[in-house]
Swiss-Prot record:
Name of this protein: Hsp70 nucleotide exchange factor FES1
Recorded family membership: Belongs to the FES1 family.
Record keywords: Cytoplasm, Repeat, Translation regulation
GO MF annotation: an example: adenyl-nucleotide exchange factor activity
Subcellular location: Cytoplasm
ARM repeats: 10-51, 70-109, 112-153, 156-196, 199-239
Pfam families to which the protein is assigned, alphabetical: Fes1
One GO CC annotation: cytosol
InterPro entries listed in its UniProt record: ARM-like, ARM-type_fold, Armadillo, Hsp70_NEF-Inhibitors, Nucleotide_exch_fac_Fes1, VHS_dom
Organism: Yarrowia lipolytica (strain CLIB 122 / E 150)
Amino acid sequence: MDKLLAWSVKQQQEGTNEPPPDPKLLAQLFGAPDDAQLMVQAMVVITQPDNKLEDKEVAFDNFEMLVENLDNANMMKNLKLWEPLLAQLSSPHPSLQKLAAWVVATATQNNPKSQEALVEQGDAGIKKLVDLTSHDDPEVVVKSLFALASAIRNCDDAYKLFESADGLKKVVGHLKPDATAQVKSKTLGVLTGILESETDLMKPEEKRQVFDILVKELETDDHIPSLERSLHVLVLLNQKGFPFTPEETEQVKKAAKRVEGKLDEEDVKYNEDLKYVNNL
């Protein structure tokens, strides 16, 4: 209160242009709830059985926006919010399952503390997300893939849980001709996250499986972003110690030519993956 009074006095003095007081301090001063309280309140709305589905969805949207802040995401552990959040992955309502997966993705993205907090939840987290990649609702599948990509990147403990849930086999299964562009994109995002991790996580036989599938995809897929991402994964495989035979090198170069033919001249000029393949 003293700081607020001092600021008010200075503002009234001629020629003074003091910066306004911290909005968070003002909020606390006048009794507005802080982010921790808002997160808890949102989760109460989400978990109350009698609340309308629409109200729960709005609360989830608010919760997701709050955990975009790294500090807020890391508060989830102390606030004991991980357990009720992950319970929503088993909700009978696909919209709540989707939103829960989205929050996991947001909270763990480039956030080692939240990744470890998720790992501590065991099968309720990673394994359940792997299971949801087989959901009938494509939006649940997309958000679950997004969550897995965020959760396992550069987190060996999360990858171990992913591996024990047979995650790679289930995720790679989405790389098929009839999969939507969005599902393919998120699937390739998971593979990219694994291969760009500092630790070489994939086993040789798993790399072989991914290579064989992607080479076929590059022959038939016409979605430019998917083509570019598929080629990037092939490059990452090679960089992570998966050697191409002369025949496979020709396959990759053929795929790269197909990608090149879909891009404009400027994109080709700055595409590092095309440069890499040309130098094989």
